[in-house]
Structures are given as structure tokens and as C-alpha cells.
Amino acid sequence: MAKEKFERTKEHVNVGTIGHVDHGKSTLTSAITCVLAAGLVEGGKAKCFKYEEIDKAPEEKERGITINITHVEYETAKRHYAHVDCPGHADYIKNMITGAAQMDGAILVVSAADGPMPQTREHVLLARQVNVPYIVVFMNKCDMVDDEELLELVELEVRELLSKYEYPGDEVPVIRGSALGALQELEQNSPGKWVGSIKELLNAMDEYIPTPEREVDKPFLMPIEDVFSISGRGTVVTGRVERGVLRPGDEVEIVGLREEPLKTVATSIEMFRKVLDEALPGDNIGVLLRGVGKDDVERGQVLAQPGSVKAHRKFRAQVYVLSKEEGGRHTPFFVNYRPQFYFRTADVTGTVVKLPEGVEMVMPGDNVELEVELIAPVALEEGLRFAIREGGRTVGAGVVTKILD
């Protein structure tokens, strides 16, 4: 059977389910796809995934870390959604920190029978740390709770929890429903109130989660992978465009690894030996730079729109430390630990200068906030992902949560 062409007519938004173990994240993911597949939402489209298909998530590797993660896609009349679901708690932490699947918005699933639990809090905290901008709440298992007052109480608790982590707890949509109830209604061919709750959730996602700014509309940035000298023409840098657009004649800055950025002009752009009149995100290109010597530029710097990104040495980060079983360290590390930090194409030694209060050491398998000082400045911004390596192996992954210099 021929594959359907990916239609770019609808806005694209990345979402994912988060929340405590057994509160029904995978069941909800299944219910969303099956309600849409049943044609019960006008303009909606999906392939129905059973719970088992979502729960046995395939393994993926991101920055040297193995994560179990399921990707599904579906459409409402307004949008195309890419949706991620992770079976295990550790998988969520790893996914959110490595950015294996970035989220424009998250669906926080809370069991009405239990209310917010420890992992509910941890996921909301992480969502805040790694900049998931919007959260929509699905209060699941409402078919198991007869007491209206209990539902009110759980909703209040969830709103307070969101406010505590700087989400607008009073404005966040909270949908009361039952994912399993919706699947049962579909099975009995009698869509009712629980299928209605899934439709309500989709509507809340469409209305409440804004469409993210497209990569192509952001300021241009390309991590430099390689530098060549072409006799008679000058210096060429190669790399893959991360965001924005570059056209011949554009002014650019070379940022990182040196104290000051270097201004230059992109005189010509090539891809697969053909000259390009514009480079877009994802393009692997070579850029000829005006008046730049081969020694003025190196791998690990970035080529960027002037003024759009600065180089920094000090930052705070949320880090996941690989366990011994994942090929990580076998022993803890302490303040003054000095591994290599990999940002895009840059590989720079840094020192862990601060751990959270009361934390003396970090064990393999931990998820921790720490402060780092690099020996050379790197083009950094909040939300940037990195890997931590020592002796050629990955021992951790992190995300920059705050620039400190």
C-alpha cells in the first residue's frame, strides 16, 4: 500500500502525556487515537492504537541514552499533532532532559481517584525546568468517583500544584473524563459522556496550546562542524542549519570558544555542490565567509544572526546521570567534578561548581540540578541540551535552565 503523503496544510504541534505511574497516560493516548479514528471528531484523523501497542514502547537512543518512547500522530480539524508517551517514570525524566521529543504542550494526566502523587509533582517540576510552555490537565478515572466534592478537591489540588511551579493554575483547562470509559463506549458502539471528555480534551489542546514559532522564523543559527580553506576563494564552514534562514550576502557572527564574536558575511552557500539562494532548517550546507582566515574559526563555534546568541561559561542545568547499567559511572561524583560537556558540535571541559543544598554527592541514576563553569565560552541559551562525557563515554545528559554570566 502506498504511503500517504504528509500534508503540511495544518499547523504542527508537539505534545506528550505526563503524570504519575498508573494514572492512565497510555490508556489516554490510546483513547485519543481511537476516538479520532472512529470518525467522531469532524476533520479528525488517526490510526487507532491499542493500549498494548503504546505500552510496549520501542527503545530509542538520544545523546547516548536509551529511552523507551512511543510516538503517535493524529489530526484535529485545526492541527496535526505529534504525541509522545513513555511507559516508565525514568523514561519521562530522560526524555524531558535530553529533549528526545520536545513538547510545545503537555497533557498532565491525574487520576481522580488518587489525586496528585509524587511523580505528578516531579513531572510538573521538570516540565517547568525544561521549558514546556503549556499544560492541559486530563482528570482521568472519573467513572470511579461518585463524589462530586472529591472531584472538586482533586481539581483544586492540581491547580495549586501547577501554580506552585509557575503555571497559571487558575487558567489551565481541566477536563474530567475517563480514558478507559471512552474505549469501552467505542467497543460497545455507544459513544457517550466519556468519548465526549476526549473530544473536550482535543478541543482544549487546539484552543489553549498556541502554535509554536516555526524554526524557520527564528534567528539563523548553524553549529560549525568543519572548516576548509579553498585556495583563491577563502574559508568555508560546514554544518546543518538548526534554525532560521540564511541567504548569500547576509551578515553573520561566529560565536563561541573566543572571547569576542567575529562578524563576517556569508558570500555564498552550497549544498551537495550546488549553489543555494537560501538555506533552511535541516539543510547541510557549506558557507563561504568573507575575509575570515582558516584559523579564525573552528568546530564547536556557531554561525548565527548577529546579536542573536552570546557565548557564556557559567550556567545552571538539570542533569540526568546515567546508571551503571546504562553504561554510565559506577561511582558517585562530587563538587569539582571535571568532565567534558558537549553542546551541539562543541566539546569543552567544565567543572561542577555547585550542587543543591544538602546534596553532598550525585549517584549514577540520579536526576539533579547543578551549576557548571566551562574553561572556554560556548554559544549557550536556556533550553539548550548537552551531553556529559568522560573517557569517551556518555555519563549524563542535561538541559541549560539558567545562564549565570
Curated annotation (Swiss-Prot):
Region called G4, residue ranges: 140-143
Q: Which UniProt keywords apply?
A: Cytoplasm, Elongation factor, GTP-binding, Hydrolase, Magnesium, Metal-binding, Nucleotide-binding, Protein biosynthesis
Q: Name one GO cellular component term.
A: cytosol
Q: Where does Mg(2+) bind?
A: 26
EC identifiers of the protein? 3.6.5.3
Keyword Nucleotide-binding appears in the UniProt entry: yes
In this chain the tr-type G domain maps to 10-213
Q: Binding positions for GTP?
A: 19-26, 85-89, 140-143
Region feature G3, mapped onto this chain: 85-88
Q: Which reaction does it catalyse?
A: GTP + H2O = GDP + phosphate + H(+)
| Top enzyme category | hydrolase
Read off the InterPro entries from this record: EF-Tu_GTP-bd, EF-Tu_GTPase, EFTu-like_2, EFTU_2, G_TR_CS, P-loop_NTPase, Small_GTP-bd, T_Tr_GTP-bd_dom
Where is the segment annotated G1? 19-26
Gene Ontology terms for molecular function: GTP binding; GTPase activity; translation elongation factor activity
Q: Which Gene3D superfamilies match?
A: P-loop containing nucleotide triphosphate hydrolases, Translation factors
SUPFAM superfamilies for this protein: EF-Tu/eEF-1alpha/eIF2-gamma C-terminal domain, P-loop containing nucleoside triphosphate hydrolases, Translation proteins
Segments of this protein annotated with the region G5: 178-180
Is Iron among this UniProt entry's keywords?
no
Q: Where is this region: G2?
A: 64-68
Major location (coarse): cytoplasm
Name the protein family: Belongs to the TRAFAC class translation factor GTPase superfamily. Classic translation factor GTPase family. EF-Tu/EF-1A subfamily.
Q: How does it assemble?
A: Monomer.
Q: Function of this protein?
A: GTP hydrolase that promotes the GTP-dependent binding of aminoacyl-tRNA to the A-site of ribosomes during protein biosynthesis.
Task: Spell out the protein name for this chain.
Answer: Elongation factor Tu
Tell me what organism the protein belongs to. Aquifex pyrophilus
Which gene underlies this protein? Answer: tuf
